[in-house]
């Protein structure tokens, strides 16, 4: 049933859903509706069984090729090789499954948040029922401490306030009333006569008629968006999939050539299959998943130490490509601690230093001559039910901010409150927008009075005023004073400040009835002051936003607050761009959104669908988008973003939808995480360049050996290939992945979503280096066989050559253009140690006892070993010459 319930009167709503609010639904009618529409619950997301998720890990091209190679190995009797390869695929699958298992369903977390019971009227009596039995038309009773069980139209409200922060992002509880909302298509935060499922009642009481249950609620709509939000692969993952396919294709073509040549030469089928299996193993980067997981795990540990916990390792990689951050305002860019920054009365003006709930600020008297601020702010302190406990506010955050003001003014708040015994309270209500407490006091002559201390929205308080307090004396509230007050409020409002006013009025004790019409007594007020307050930016947010901008990352503020407040905070933080309402952004055509998005810096009063729309628009523009949030309303956009970031203090729904959790809720941590992500992405590219050199060398080496019939077409055995992959390239790759950050990394442009890891320069380098290494290996094998008349010596020399050239390649791959003949080349201690170990192993495979038996190599003389290692020196010289040419062409300056 889709209706604009907020636009209907309570009587119209009751008629629409066919219920008598006084009696509630008849039990029989409720049962009919329950049977027709189903329970008031959200559909749970059923996870796939563990075995299905395990088998799903075998859908990647690499896993398929490895399984095929293992089966072929077993078929021709190479049991050890086949079993080893199957174990490798199982380890890869378990690694992927382990990461997948950490991501709990956001939908199921949403389901678990729903309340379990509700108080309703049925057949004229109040009954308590399970929340999933609530139906449209039920009359639900609400009181402080309850969670709203469904969406409903409020028909009675007594000082009713509901915390809707999880749905709207607004940190202050929403005041509710029964009045019709006349706005057109208001966002949830502006529907003041509606209550929404799963929001807690914080104050007062009320009655509502249920208008939506289950999937037809605001929370249900969010659940639907979560269900429809696609799970996206990271940019690097997509490119590696494509790269693996290309390499597999090249290997497949080489294998076909090998088969054709082998058959034409009369080679045995088993020999041909053995060679084909060896090439298949060589052409697949089987160690890559392990190496990448080690690299990303290291980054994840570093991030966790700085307050950012990643749930999936590929999120670290995505951070490195982030080009746009859509950030929530409250608590992320700001402190989520309302702070009074200015106090104004008719004769004086004060600015207040310090931020948040800390008491270390002070009151600075910037205009006027009154000796003390106490009389001006006293109503804010007396008409106040909050408490400050260990730097935290217990109660309403706005009242807490006013208490902090009192402490900064050196006022004994508790003593002042005790000296003015409270006899009655008029609670805040959105219809009159103020609060008043009535206390026993004495007037200037010492006569007893009932003094009302009033605080509330400035227009509401001033509208009941006849005078003001100026320099300790009462002055009439005339046109001049009204004009001055309006000017000050306009100034404060333009700065995004929330404005409140305070006042007093003395009432005769005679005939005062604390249970009577207290609102009628709040007349003829004497205004004492107006205050401006704001949730201030975090001290570190300004530098963090600047750092993001210097890294060419566009920061946008997405907030549930109004546009003026958002724009004011954005200006303080240096966030550029126009401020626009979420509804206005959604009303644009897709072409207009794509055209205007670059100029937008703040989006206010956003609904969940607006946030998703922003993410989708930016992604269509080619941006890699990070989205932060903490509420249920943020979860769909968090899930839709390339990197969803949830606040540690946020809802479990948001945390489950996100890929990263900020334990300190701090925007600066996001920028630090992006820096770490860029470093790891850059290091992974170093590893990928190194890995590609090895893969191209493999394929070309086998191709040349087959065409020229060198070493029987099989330059390396399967055991030697596994050795190279897991004992040489894997440790070296990990060392590259743990490299230090390249200077100037954060000043680079973010990597475009469409940018290829295979740039023309990389293709040229990898192709030339791989070709040289392949030719060198085959030449050495031919030379060794002719010179020493034994294939064993020749093949071992080829393996030594490959090993030593890979060590040179590791150092050269650290930078595409910079020479390795500089001090910085050896600042990676892990790589230095790894290189020394690899050189030692290259010696042992040709001189020791155990490794030659394991690999099938033979013992070399020192002269033979040096000949085998000599191509590494030639490779070094050639690579350095190539880098020198590249530097001169690009004007790149580097140490020689």
Question: What label would you give each PLM region?
Answer:
Residues 95, 125, 211-214, 227, ...:
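Conserved beta-strand/loop elements of the cytosolic catalytic core of P-type E1-E2 ATPases, chiefly
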Residues 64-87, 246-284, 297, 301-307, ...:
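Helix-interface capping motifs at the ends of transmembrane segments in multi-pass membrane proteins
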Residues 372-374, 577-627, 641, 648-818:
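Membrane-embedded transport module
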Residues 80-115, 122, 232-329, 338, ...:
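Hydrophobic alpha-helical transmembrane segments
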Residues 1-126, 132-135, 140-148, 153-161, ...:
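Non-lumenal N-terminal regulatory segments of integral membrane proteins
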Residues 1-22, 154-194, 306-450, 470-480, ...:
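Conserved cytosolic catalytic headpiece of P-type ATPases
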Residues 542-544, 562-572, 609-617, 631-641:
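Acidic, divalent-metal-coordinating active-site segment for phosphoryl/phosphodiester hydrolysis
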Residues 40-71, 104, 126-127, 185-194, ...:
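Soluble-to-membrane junctions at the N-terminal ends of transmembrane alpha-helices
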């Amino acid at each position: 049933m889709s209706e604009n319930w907020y636009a209907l009167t309570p009587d119209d709503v009751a008629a629409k859903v066919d219920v008598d609010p006084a009696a509630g639904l008849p039990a029989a009618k409720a049962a009919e509706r329950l049977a027709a529409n189903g329970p008031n619950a959200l559909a749970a997301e059923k996870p796939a069984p563990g075995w299905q998720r395990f088998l799903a890990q075998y859908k990647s091209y690499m896993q398929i090729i490895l399984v095929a190679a293992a089966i072929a190995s077993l078929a021709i009797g190479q049991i050890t090789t086949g079993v080893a390869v199957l174990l490798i695929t199982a380890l890869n699958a378990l690694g992927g499954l382990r990461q997948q298992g950490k991501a709990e369903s956001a939908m199921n977390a949403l389901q678990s948040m729903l309340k379990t019971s509700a108080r309703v009227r049925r057949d004229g009596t109040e009954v308590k029922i399970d929340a999933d039995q609530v139906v449209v038309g039920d009359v639900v009773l609400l009181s402080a401490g309850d969670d709203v069980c469904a969406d409903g139209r409020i028909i009675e409200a007594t000082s009713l306030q509901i915390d809707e922060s999880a749905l709207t992002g607004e940190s202050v509880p929403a005041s509710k009333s029964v009045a019709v909302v006349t706005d057109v298509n208001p966002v949830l935060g502006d529907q003041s006569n509606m209550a929404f499922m799963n929001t807690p009642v914080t104050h007062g009481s009320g009655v509502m008629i249920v208008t939506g249950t289950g999937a037809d609620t605001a929370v249900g709509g969010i659940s639907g968006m979560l269900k429809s939000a696609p799970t996206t692969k990271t940019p690097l993952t997509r490119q590696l999939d494509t790269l693996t396919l290309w390499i597999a294709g090249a290997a497949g073509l080489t294998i076909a050539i090998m088969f054709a040549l082998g058959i034409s030469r009369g080679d045995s089928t088993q020999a041909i299959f053995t060679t084909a299996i060896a090439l298949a193993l060589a052409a697949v980067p089987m160690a890559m998943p392990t190496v990448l997981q080690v690299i990303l795990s290291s980054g994840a540990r570093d991030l966790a130490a700085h307050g950012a916990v990643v749930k999936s390792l590929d999120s670290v990689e995505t951070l490195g490509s982030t080009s746009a951050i859509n950030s929530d305002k409250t608590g992320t860019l700001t402190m989520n601690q309302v702070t009074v920054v200015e106090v104004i009365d008719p004769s004086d003006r004060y600015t207040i230093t310090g931020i948040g709930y800390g008491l270390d600020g002070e009151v600075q008297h910037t205009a006027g001559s009154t000796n003390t601020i106490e009389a001006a702010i006293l109503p804010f302190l007396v008409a106040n039910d909050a408490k400050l406990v260990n730097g935290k506010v217990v109660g309403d955050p706005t009242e807490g901010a006013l208490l902090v003001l009192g402490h900064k003014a050196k006022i004994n708040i508790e003593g002042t409150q005790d000296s003015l015994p409270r006899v009655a309270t008029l609670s805040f209500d959105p219809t009159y927008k103020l609060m008043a407490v009535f206390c026993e006091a004495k007037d200037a002559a010492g006569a007893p009075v009932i003094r009302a201390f009033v605080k509330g929205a400035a227009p509401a308080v001033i509208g009941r005023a006849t005078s003001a307090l100026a320099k300790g004396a009462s002055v009439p509230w005339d046109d001049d004073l009204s004009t001055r007050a309006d000017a000050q409020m306009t100034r404060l409002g333009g700065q995004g400040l929330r404005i409140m006013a305070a006042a007093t009025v003395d009432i005769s004790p005679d005939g005062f009835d604390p249970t009577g019409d207290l609102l009628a007594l709040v007349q003829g007020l004497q205004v004492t002051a107006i205050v401006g307050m704001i949730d201030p930016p975090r001290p570190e947010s300004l530098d963090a936003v600047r750092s993001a901008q210097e890294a060419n990352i566009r920061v946008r503020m997405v907030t549930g607050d109004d546009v003026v407040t958002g724009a004011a905070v954005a200006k303080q933080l240096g966030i550029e761009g126009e401020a626009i309402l979420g509804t206005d952004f959604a009303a644009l055509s897709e072409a207009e959104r794509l055209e205007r998005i670059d100029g937008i810096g703040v989006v206010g009063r956003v609904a969940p669908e607006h946030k998703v729309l922003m993410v989708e628009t930016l992604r269509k523009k080619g941006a890699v988008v990070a989205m932060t949030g903490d509420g249920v309303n943020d979860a769909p956009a968090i899930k839709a973003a390339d990197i969803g970031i949830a606040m540690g203090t946020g809802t479990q729904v948001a945390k489950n939808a996100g890929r990263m959790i900020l334990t300190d809720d701090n925007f600066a941590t996001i920028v630090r995480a992006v820096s770490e992500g860029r470093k790891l992405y850059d290091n992974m590219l170093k590893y990928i360049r190194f890995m590609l050199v090895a893969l191209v060398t493999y394929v070309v080496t086998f191709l040349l050996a087959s065409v020229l019939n060198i070493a029987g077409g099989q330059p390396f055995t399967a055991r030697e290939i596994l050795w190279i992959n897991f004992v040489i390239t894997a440790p070296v790759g990990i060392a590259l992945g743990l490299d230090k950050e390249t200077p100037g990394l954060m000043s680079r442009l973010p990597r475009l979503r469409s940018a290829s890891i295979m740039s023309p320069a990389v293709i040229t380098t990898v192709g030339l280096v791989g070709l040289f290494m392949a030719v060198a290996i085959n030449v050495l094998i031919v030379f060794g066989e002719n010179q020493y008349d034994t294939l064993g010596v020749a093949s071992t020399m080829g393996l030594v050559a490959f090993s030593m050239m890979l060590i040179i390649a590791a150092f050269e791959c650290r930078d595409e253009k910079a020479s390795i003949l500089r001090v910085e080349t050896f600042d990676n201690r892990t790589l230095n140690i790894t290189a020394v170990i690899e050189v030692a192993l290259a010696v042992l495979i040709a001189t020791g006892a155990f490794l030659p038996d394991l690999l099938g190599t033979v013992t070399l003389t020192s002269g033979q070993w040096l000949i085998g290692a000599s191509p590494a020196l030639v490779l070094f010289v050639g690579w350095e010459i190539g880098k020198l040419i590249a530097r001169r062409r690009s004007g790149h300056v580097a140490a020689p």
